[in-house]
Structures are given as structure tokens and as C-alpha cells.
């Protein structure tokens, strides 16, 4: 009985398998194949059992039945090939090889089975060769469908990947067999595979035997690629994919050179732009593989074709590719090793280039002068030898032409060509200065440059400045006398009149570059002149002379900062600038805030330049920072007769400029040096310790946190700049006391500048404070101060500012308390007094600051804080908007608009459908800030989410047109930009509104503001073109 039960259990699965096979083969159902494969993978059946169940189907007299049987077996093998044993693979391959001779209906399924077996790790040695021989012999690949041809290429690819040595054993027969398979292929999907196979044949050193030309012919027949992908191509194959794949084949071996180069020359000389580009790019790629031997016979023809394209083409792309090809050709010839008796192909090639180009450099009309120069420079840039050969021949000619031509624009053209050759010289190093090709021309070059610098033409002066910079960058070309003259010219150009600003800027930039290389020359010849100019400027400002004198003074400040590019020069310019401030502080000048701000800007630029050199940076910090603090402290002291400047130094704008200098001079300090500085500056503010300040005999104590004057309290802005720029790991002395004093000042004084400075300082330090008990104590104090301040009529504004900055400090670092503080901020949106400010506060929370809480100042700023803030708070803002009274809704809209406007667009797009209605409502808000913020948010969305925006086109058109008449110029401009962006929506959606929009946009064409008119013209033009052919 038990034996009978076991027999039934064995028979039952086979019966189920036969049923599935029958359903697939005879019932034409596809599902059973996956079921059989799943059962084989789970161990329900073996592959042998599947073959047995298919027995009658595989032997059936009807080809379609045999094909279905083979198809089922192949589909199972494609999913289960990893489970096969070596013995099973052998039997299956013998079976499939035999069936390659079967009816043409059966062959595609057989090929699928062989593809599965080509991926099996159990494939015994020798069978890969056997399979490929059978395919090459029995299968007429060209008669197969695309998918079946793709299968053949896949089999070859799999075997080349796993059985390389076996296939190489076939020798050239494998290459010949593959040529037969590839011949006549047209489908781009298959060609990509075929090109990779050919590339592997060559790169992996398979034997090509006598079939090199045949292999070239079977691939080059596709050159140049003219494939255009169909619309909505599901395969994603682009023309560029095929071009690059074919190019990799054609440029993979020098053995193709004798066949390929004539083809490239023919295509370059054709009239088809794409063929020219493809051929030149392919030639460029070939030069990396070829040598002189391959190029020798084709050089005259290649040069003639390239020259013609550069001289005659109307396409900048063809010109650029032609020049790149010439560069590569010259580099290839330069790299080849010459035998003693070999012909110097590089020399003769360069001589041909010179012969065909040099006479164009001398033509009076200078018609082909630029194309000739470009060709010469493309070749010269390829190697040191080419550069030396061409430069030594061309430079004398160009120098002669410069003197022959008297017009400034012609001289400018020639000098620009000379500049091109000078730049090329910088690529190559020469151990011996006398070997430099430019050494014999240096006197003529310097003379020519100085002529250009004194020419009335601004454009020629600009080229002269650039040429001087390049000359100076090459050692040994500028003598001491040349340098003195050069510095004199740069000094003169720095003080040119207003209409020569471009020359002034270029002169300043050149001075900075050359001062790095020749600090001694600039120290001797320029700094004394600038010091004298600065002293004259002091007296000019004191006499309140005309704007010309003042502008010279400002230019002098710019020049001092521009040349501060070398440590030795910084040690001279920094004292000059600081002394200039000190002179003003002594009351010797009638000074305006703009003057002090200008000096501070120069100091900041010097500090930025010093950041690259730690030693120079520390010198700047230890020299400038104490001096600036001393000046500010002196200015804050009560005096019977305070100077005008002392009052100026305490103005908001000037303190902000001083703070920027101090911050810039601190951010790059090492922790060790920063620790030295912080032990002096914090006690200055907490204890009035002025001992480290220069000239520290002050008439009164400095106590900004006690009962000091309002002027002293304002200097907390400078403390903020310093401590909020320190590295996070620098310990701040008396931190607990400092934080309490800052908190006290943030809500304890009526001066907004002082209280905001203290608030920012508190927030900056809070952000950097490591987690722990001390941080929690500071937070408790801050929250208590905020709540107490909000409850008091006299300090509500200061308390709100504190809430805002503390919230930002915590949002940036993902602190849990930030959620509670943000909720508190949202609650204030309904406050009659603070609601509008609370809405604007969301802009601060989402924006990057420039003074505190910056990454440059070492603040703890998490990368995705905006995304997190959006996710955590926008739902509450939306909910609050819906629940708020009508008069409060604008505040919620403003807050929401600020958040969305500063959110990365990829984060906003998925949420757009739910938020768009609110954004549209925000456009109706009377607040111009809300309107502008919302328009700024919507404009990129019109470009990036046209399908969603199309659903609201009626509302968008109406609201944008209304806002194009807003009283705010910024809103009008933004609305017109959105009208322009609307044209990116589907044309069919926009056409019903075309005439309405064109009429409405006629009004802003007459706007009184030029920028509004400009946007109106642009937008109206795009709407006019809607629906026209080619739009």
C-alpha cells in the first residue's frame, strides 16, 4: 500500500508538468513557461524531466509544434541556467546544435536556448567553439528577425567574455565567421552590440588574419552615422551612442589607417556638415593610436582638407574640430621616435603649414589673418618642438606687421595673435633660459607692449595689458628696466578716467598677478607712488575737493588691495591702509561713511588674498584686528569734542564693513591661533581689558555689557563677527557669562542695531555649542527670555528677533527644540502687531546668511535643512491658512511663499499639485513681497512642470496679466517673465489665449521703466510666435 502511495506521488508531479507543457505547446498559452521555470528553480522538477515531458513535442512532425517545444525549453533554461550540471549542458548543446539545421521556424527558439547555455558556468571547454562554428555554418543570420539577430550577437558577446582563450584558438576563422554574421546589419540595437564585439576583437588581440580589410569594410560602411531615433523611442538609443561606438572601432587600430584615412578625407571634403564633423572628430581619435608610418602618405591631403575647412567654413563647430584635428596630427608626428636615417615628417609638415599660412599674415586687407593664426597656433600648441619651430618663424613676421600697420584695430589684431603664441610658450618648460624661443625677441616684444599700453585705443590697451601679464609670467623676459616701465604704465592705467573702467580693472588684475611674481619691483616702484597718492587723497578729502580727486582716492585704495598678493607686499600695504584709518580717526579729515567703507572693503580684499597663505593670514589678523577694535573702542568713548570720524565709525554701515573685515580675517585661522586671539577679545568685552590693543590709553572704561554708552553697546557687532567666525573646536573663555550678557542685551535696550547684534552673536554661538547640559541651559534661558519679552509691550520686537534667530540656529543643526520654536513662530502669524514680521521671518529661516550662521564661519549647517523644514512645517502652514480668519490669511500665504521660493525645485515638484492652489491665491494677496516671492517660485515651475501648470492656465494668464500693471517695478518684471515662461506650456493649451495676451502686453511696452519694457518685448514676441511653423 505504501509503495503504491509513493508511486502515485511521483506520477502526480509529472502529470502536472505534462499538463503545463501541453498548455504551452498546444494551447498557445505563455504563462506555463514561467510556472515550469519556477518549479525547476524550487526543485519541483529537473531540467531532464522537462526535456522528457517535451519529448513528443520536440519530435513532432509539425514545425510549429517543434518550435513551441524548443521555445518552452529555452525559456526555462534562460531562468535556470545556473542550476545546470556539466553533463546536462553537454547534452543540451548537442541537442541545440543539431536543431540549428531544423526548420526556420524552430531556429529562433534554438538560439534562445544557446544564449542561455552561453551564460552557464558549467559549460565545458571546447563547446563555445563548437556552438559558434555551428552558428556560422548553419544559420543565415541576415534572414532572421531583429530580436533573433540580437540573440546571435549576445551569444558571441557572452562567449568572448567567458571563453576568450578558446575563441582565440579559432584564429582568423572566428573573425571571418563574425564578419559573415554582421554583414548587412541595419538595426541600431544590434549595431551597438556588433560595434562592441569588433572593438573587443581588436583591443583584446584576436587574430584578424587576412581579413583586416573585410572587417574594416563591414564596419566602415556605416560611417558616417545618419541614424535619427524615432519619436518616443522606447530603446533610448541616440545617434551619438552609435557615433561614439563606431568611432571607437575605427580608431582602435593602426591597421585600419590605409583604408580609413582616404574615407575621412573624402567625407571632410563633402558638403554634409555632420559628415565633416564626424570625420574630423574620428581623425582626432585616430591620432592617439597612429604613428608617422600610418600618416605619412596622407599628410598633404589631410592638411589640404583641414586648411580648406578652417579658411572657408561658415560653421564654428567645423572650424573648432578642424583645429583640434590639426593639433592632434602635429602631436602624433611629434611623439613618434625618429631613426637617424628617417625623414623628419614633423619638420616638413610644419613647413607646409608655414608656407600656406604666412603670406596671409602679410596681406594688407588681413582677410585670412585670423584663420591662418588659428591654424598656426593649433599646430604650435601640440608640442614644444612644434611651438619652437612655428613661433621662431612667425613672431618676426608679426612684429614687423605690427609696425607696418598704423591703425589701432589692426595693431590690436596682430597683438592678439602674438599673445596667442606667447600663451602657448607657457605650456613647455625649458631648463636653459637661453633656449627659450622668445629670448631673442624679448626687447622687441616689450617695446611693442609698451606702445600698445600708451595707445589711445582702449581695446589695444586691454590686449597690451594681457600680453604684459603673459610676458611677465615667463622667467627672464622682463628686465629690471622693463619691470619699472611696466609698473609705471600699470600705475597710470589704474587712474584713467571713468570711460576707461575696463582698462582700470584689467590693470589692477595684471598688477596683482605680476606682484606675485615680482614683489620687489612693485614694492620699489609702485607702493611709494600709491602711498603718496593716498596721502594726497587724505588732504583732498579733508578739503572736500571735487569728485575727481575723491575718485582717485578710491582707486588708490583699490590698487593697494589689488597688489597685496605677496606676503612681503602685504606687510607694506596693510600698515598703509590701517594708518589711513588712524589718520582719519584723529580728526584730520572730514570723513564720510563711504570713505571708511571703501577702506574697509580694501582691507577685506587683502584679507581674502591672504587666506591662501597661513603665515600671511596670521600677520593680517594679528595686525589688523586689534587695530580695528582699538579704533572702534576709541570712537565709542565719550569725549567733549568727538571728531566727525568717531561718529562715522559708529554708523551702522561702517560697523558692518568693519565686521566683514574682522570676520574675513578670522574664518581661516587654525584652532591654535584662534585660541590665542579669543583669549584677548572676549575679555575686552566682558572685563574691559584693553591691554592687547595698540594705543590703549582710553579716557574711560570700555564696558559694553554693563552701563556703557550706546556707542559701546553697538560694538557688539564686531564681537559677533569675531566669535561667530571661529572654528567650532575653539574654546571661548567665560562662555556662560558671555551668553547671559548677550541675552540680556538682546532684549534689554531700545537700540535695534545693538540688540540685533547681540541676538545674532547669541544664535551663532548657540549653533556651534556641542550637545550637552550647557546647551540645554542656554536654550532654557533663551526660551524664557523670549516668552518674557513677548509678554512685555516694551520689548516685543527684540524678543521676536531673538526667537527668529534662535530658531534659525537650531533649524540649521536639526535640534529637536526647533520644532517647538517654529510652532511658536507660526502662532505669531495671527498676532496683530508681529504677524507680518513673523511671515517675513520664514524667509530668514530658509535663506543663507552672509554674516553669521554660515558654512564659511564654521556654523553647523546640515545639507538638507530646507527639505526637512519643508516636510516638518508646510502641512501646518497650510492647515493654519485654512483655519485662519480672512485678515490673517495673507500672513500665512507670505510665510508659505517664502518657504516654497527657497526650496530646491526637485523637492517642490512632487508636492506641486497640492500646493498650487495656495500659490495661485497668493498672487491675489495685496502685499507686493508675497506677489514677488510667489512669482519667483512659479517661473521655474512653468519650465519644469508644464503638464501640471497647464491645468491652471486660465488662472495663470489672468493673474500674470493683472500683475504686469502692478505699482511695484519688480513685480511687473517678474509677472512678464512668467508670461514669457508660460509659452513653454503645450501650444494647444495656450492658443485660445494668444490674441488676449498680445493685446494686454501692448500696455507694458510703453512702461516708463526700461527693464519692464525689455521684458514685455521678450514675452510678447514669444506669444506672437505661438503656433507658427517651427516654433
From Swiss-Prot:
Knockout consequences: Embryonically lethality before the implantation stage.
Coiled coil: none
Any one of the GO BP annotations: protein maturation
Tissue-level expression: Ubiquitously expressed with higher expression in testis.
Keywords, ordered alphabetically: Acetylation, Activator, Chromosome partition, Cytoplasm, Cytoskeleton, DNA damage, DNA repair, Nucleus, Phosphoprotein, Repeat, Transcription, Transcription regulation, Ubl conjugation
GO cellular component, one term: cytoplasm
Keyword GTP-binding: no
UniProt GO molecular function: enzyme binding; nuclear estrogen receptor binding; transcription coactivator activity
Domain of life assignment: Eukaryota
KW Glycoprotein (keyword) present: no
Residues found modified as N-acetylalanine: 2
Subcellular location: Nucleus; Cytoplasm, Cytoskeleton, Spindle
Family in the record: Belongs to the MET18/MMS19 family.
Protein name: MMS19 nucleotide excision repair protein homolog
Gene: Mms19
Amino acid at each position: 500500500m505504501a509503495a503504491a502511495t509513493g508511486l502515485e506521488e511521483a506520477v502526480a508531479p509529472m502529470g502536472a508538468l505534462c499538463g503545463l507543457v501541453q498548455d504551452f505547446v498546444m494551447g498557445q498559452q505563455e504563462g506555463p513557461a514561467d510556472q515550469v521555470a519556477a518549479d525547476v528553480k524550487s526543485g519541483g522538477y529537473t531540467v531532464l524531466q522537462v526535456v522528457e515531458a517535451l519529448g513528443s513535442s520536440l519530435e513532432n512532425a509539425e514545425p510549429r509544434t517543434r518550435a513551441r517545444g524548443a521555445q518552452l525549453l529555452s525559456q526555462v533554461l534562460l531562468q535556470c541556467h545556473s542550476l545546470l550540471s556539466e553533463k546536462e549542458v553537454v547534452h543540451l548543446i548537442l541537442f541545440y546544435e543539431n536543431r540549428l539545421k531544423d526548420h526556420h521556424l524552430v531556429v529562433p527558439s534554438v538560439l534562445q536556448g544557446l544564449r542561455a547555455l552561453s551564460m552557464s558556468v558549467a559549460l565545458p571547454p571546447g563547446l563555445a567553439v563548437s556552438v559558434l562554428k555551428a552558428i556560422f555554418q548553419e544559420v543565415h543570420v541576415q534572414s532572421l528577425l531583429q530580436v533573433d539577430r540580437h540573440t546571435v550577437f549576445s551569444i558571441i558577446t557572452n562567449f568572448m567574455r567567458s571563453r576568450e582563450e578558446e575563441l582565440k584558438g579559432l584564429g582568423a576563422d572566428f573573425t571571418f565567421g563574425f564578419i559573415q554574421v554582421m554583414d548587412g546589419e541595419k538595426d541600431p540595437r544590434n549595431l551597438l552590440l556588433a560595434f562592441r564585439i569588433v572593438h573587443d576583437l581588436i583591443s583584446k588581440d584576436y587574430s584578424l588574419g587576412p581579413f583586416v580589410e573585410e572587417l574594416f569594410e563591414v564596419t566602415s560602411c556605416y560611417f558616417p552615422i545618419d541614424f535619427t531615433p524615432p519619436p518616443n523611442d522606447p530603446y533610448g538609443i541616440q545617434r551619438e551612442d552609435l557615433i561614439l561606438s563606431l568611432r571607437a572601432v575605427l580608431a582602435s587600430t593602426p591597421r585600419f589607417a590605409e583604408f580609413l584615412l582616404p574615407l575621412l578625407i573624402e567625407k571632410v571634403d563633402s558638403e554634409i556638415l555632420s559628415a565633416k564633423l564626424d570625420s574630423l572628430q574620428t581623425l582626432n581619435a585616430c591620432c592617439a593610436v597612429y604613428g608617422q608610418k600610418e600618416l605619412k602618405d596622407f599628410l598633404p591631403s589631410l592638411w589640404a582638407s583641414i586648411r580648406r575647412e578652417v579658411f572657408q567654413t561658415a560653421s564654428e563647430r567645423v572650424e573648432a574640430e578642424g583645429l583640434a584635428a590639426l593639433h592632434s596630427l602635429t602631436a602624433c608626428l611629434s611623439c613618434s621616435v625618429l631613426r637617424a636615417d628617417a625623414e623628419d615628417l614633423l619638420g616638413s609638415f610644419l613647413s607646409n603649414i608655414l608656407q600656406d599660412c604666412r603670406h596671409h599674415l602679410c596681406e594688407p586687407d588681413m582677410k585670412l589673418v585670423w584663420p591662418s593664426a588659428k591654424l598656426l597656433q593649433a599646430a604650435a600648441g601640440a608640442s614644444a618642438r612644434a611651438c619652437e619651430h612655428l613661433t621662431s618663424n612667425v613672431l618676426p613676421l608679426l612684429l614687423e606687421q605690427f609696425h607696418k600697420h598704423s591703425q589701432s584695430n589692426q595693431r590690436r589684431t596682430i597683438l592678439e595673435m602674438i599673445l596667442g603664441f606667447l600663451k602657448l610658450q607657457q605650456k613647455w618648460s625649458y631648463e636653459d633660459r637661453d633656449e627659450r624661443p622668445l629670448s631673442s625677441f624679448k626687447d622687441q616684444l616689450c617695446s611693442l607692449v609698451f606702445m600698445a599700453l600708451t595707445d589711445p585705443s582702449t581695446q589695444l590697451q586691454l590686449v597690451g595689458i594681457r600680453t604684459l601679464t603673459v610676458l611677465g609670467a615667463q622667467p627672464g623676459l622682463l628686465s629690471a628696466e622693463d619691470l619699472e616701465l611696466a609698473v609705471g604704465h600699470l600705475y597710470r592705467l589704474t587712474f584713467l578716467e571713468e570711460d576707461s573702467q575696463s582698462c582700470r580693472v584689467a590693470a589692477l588684475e595684471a598688477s596683482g598677478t605680476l606682484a606675485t611674481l615680482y614683489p620687489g619691483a612693485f614694492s620699489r616702484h609702485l607702493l611709494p607712488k600709491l602711498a603718496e597718492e593716498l596721502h594726497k587723497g587724505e588732504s583732498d578729502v579733508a578739503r572736500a575737493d571735487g569728485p575727481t580727486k575723491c575718485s582717485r582716492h578710491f582707486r588708490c585704495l583699490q590698487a593697494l588691495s589689488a597688489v597685496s598678493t605677496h606676503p612681503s607686499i602685504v606687510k607694506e600695504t596693510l600698515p598703509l591702509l590701517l594708518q589711513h584709518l588712524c589718520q582719519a580717526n584723529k580728526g584730520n579729515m572730514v570723513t564720510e561713511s563711504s570713505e571708511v567703507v571703501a577702506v574697509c572693503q580694501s582691507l577685506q580684499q587683502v584679507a581674502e588674498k591672504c587666506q591662501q597663505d597661513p603665515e600671511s593670514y596670521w600677520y593680517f589678523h594679528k595686525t589688523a584686528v586689534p587695530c580695528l577694535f582699538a579704533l572702534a573702542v576709541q570712537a565709542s568713548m565719550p569725549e567733549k569734542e568727538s571728531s566727525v570720524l568717531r561718529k562715522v565709525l559708529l554708523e551702522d554701515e561702517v560697523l558692518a564693513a568693519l565686521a566683514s573685515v574682522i570676520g574675513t580675517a578670522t574664518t581661516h585661522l587654525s584652532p591654535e591661533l584662534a585660541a590665542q586671539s579669543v583669549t584677548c577679545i572676549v575679555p575686552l568685552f566682558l572685563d574691559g581689558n584693553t591691554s592687547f590693543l595698540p594705543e590703549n590709553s582710553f579716557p574711560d572704561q570700555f564696558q559694553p555689557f554693563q552701563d556703557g554708552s550706546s556707542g559701546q553697546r553697538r560694538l557688539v557687532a564686531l564681537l559677533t563677527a569675531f566669535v561667530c567666525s571661529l572654528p567650532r573646536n575653539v574654546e571661548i573663555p567665560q562662555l556662560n557669562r558671555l551668553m547671559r550678557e548677550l541675552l540680556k542685551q538682546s532684549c534689554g535696550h531700545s537700540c535695534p542695531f545693538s540688540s540685533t547684534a547681540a541676538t545674532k552673536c547669541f544664535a551663532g554661538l548657540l549653533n556651534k555649542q556641542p550637545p550637552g547640559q550647557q546647551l540645554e541651559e542656554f536654550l532654557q534661558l533663551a526660551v524664557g527670555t523670549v516668552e518674557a519679552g513677548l509678554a512685555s509691550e516694551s520689548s516685543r520686537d527684540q524678543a521676536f528677533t531673538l526667537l527668529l534667530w534662535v530658531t534659525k540656529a537650531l533649524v540649521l543643526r536639526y535640534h529637536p527644540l526647533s520644532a517647538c520654536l517654529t510652532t511658536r513662530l507660526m502662532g505669531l502669524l495671527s498676532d496683530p502687531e508681529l504677524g507680518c514680521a513673523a511671515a517675513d521671518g520664514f524667509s530668514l529661516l530658509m535663506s543663507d546668511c552672509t554674516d553669521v550662521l554660515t558654512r564659511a564661519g564654521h556654523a553647523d549647517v546640515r545639507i538638507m535643512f530646507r527639505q526637512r523644514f519643508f516636510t516638518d512645517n508646510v502641512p501646518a502652514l497650510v492647515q493654519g491658512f485654512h483655519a485662519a480668519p480672512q485678515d490673517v490669511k495673507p500672513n500665512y500665504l507670505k510665510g508659505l511663499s517664502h518657504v516654497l521660493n527657497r526650496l530646491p525645485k526637485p523637492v517642490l515638484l512632487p508636492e506641486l499639485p497640492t500646493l498650487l492652489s495656495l500659490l495661485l491665491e497668493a498672487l491675489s494677496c495685496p502685499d507686493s513681497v508675497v506677489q514677488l516671492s510667489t512669482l519667483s517660485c512659479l517661473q521655474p515651475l512653468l519650465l519644469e512642470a508644464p503638464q501640471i501648470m497647464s491645468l491652471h492656465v486660465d488662472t495663470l494668464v489672468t493673474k500674470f496679466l493683472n500683475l504686469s500693471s502692478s505699482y511695484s517695478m519688480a513685480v511687473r518684471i517678474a509677472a512678464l517673465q512668467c508670461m514669457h515662461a508660460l509659452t513653454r506650456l503645450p501650444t494647444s493649451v495656450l492658443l485660445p489665449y494668444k490674441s488676449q495676451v498680445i493685446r494686454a502686453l501692448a500696455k507694458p511696452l510703453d512702461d516708463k521703466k526700461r527693464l519692464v519694457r525689455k521684458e514685455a518685448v521678450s514675452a510678447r514676441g514669444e506669444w506672437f510666435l505661438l503656433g507658427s511653423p517651427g516654433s
